[in-house]
Amino acid sequence: MNQHPGPSTQEYLRLIGVPQLAPATSPFDPGYDPVTVESHLAQSAHLISILKISMACWIIADEGATLAKLAAAKRYGVPTVTGGGPFEVAVAQRQLPAYLDLCAGIGVNRIECGEGFTDLSLTPTEIARMAGERGLEFQFELGKKHGGAFTSSVTDDLIDQGKEWLAVGAKELVVEARESAQGVGLFDDAGTFNAELAEKFVDAFGFQTVMFEAPNKPSQFTLLNHFGPAVRLCNVRLEELLRVEIYRRGLHSDAFAHENLRPPRPAEG
């Protein structure tokens, strides 16, 4: 029920032509306190595809605080995923079973797998089996964290790798961009976006399967400008989620200038 005179915010968005969009951003919690995380969920849960409990912060934080964050996400109907770093460390230290037991035990829905700074000693099939035995979904991150910007041949290899992970049950694929979107993945040393290579990932997997890391404003706006509102973004800080989503809907002044983002003008009458 509307709590004030006039249209609700959702009704107003419809009046100005903004379409209803399914959640297409996976923001991350870089180690906020539980109250802050829950406040963001209260404000933006309807905009979140899956919440990443990122880096290894949740492992060294007070466990009760981590459990409180996960419980809040569950109350708001937002699934959760761990970052790829702890997974890689667990594999390298030969403790993947214990890590998976921990993730399942605290109530995470999904883990992120990857080879960003290590080389896996286990096959995708083995990892898929271990995750499945514990009721965990998994996604896979494509690309090295210290390997520089992608080349065409590297992109082709990553597409093949992504297909291998999808074949064993990966729910989504993530294209690496780290925290800088510069000198890594689809961004060169100057931060220039390689649209041609990005399109190869979309052509291979489609928007519903591939997510692009967009850790800062330039990378977020560049990806949305190029692909439009359908592109799935991740590694967006929680406090930047609303900015990304107004841009996605053409409500940001810069986005309004782009025909593929600007809402269609409603008919008169």
Where are these regions (language model features)?
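Structural preference for beta-strand elements that scaffold enzyme active sites
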Residues: L21-P27, I50-K52, G77-V81, N109-E112, ...
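Active-site mouth loops of central-metabolism enzymes
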Residues: L21-T36, S54-I59, V81-Q95, G114, ...
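Catalytic beta/alpha-barrel core
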Residues: F28-D29, K52-I60, E88-A90, L100, ...
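Catalytic cores of alpha/beta
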Residues: Q95-L100, S153-L166, N216-P229
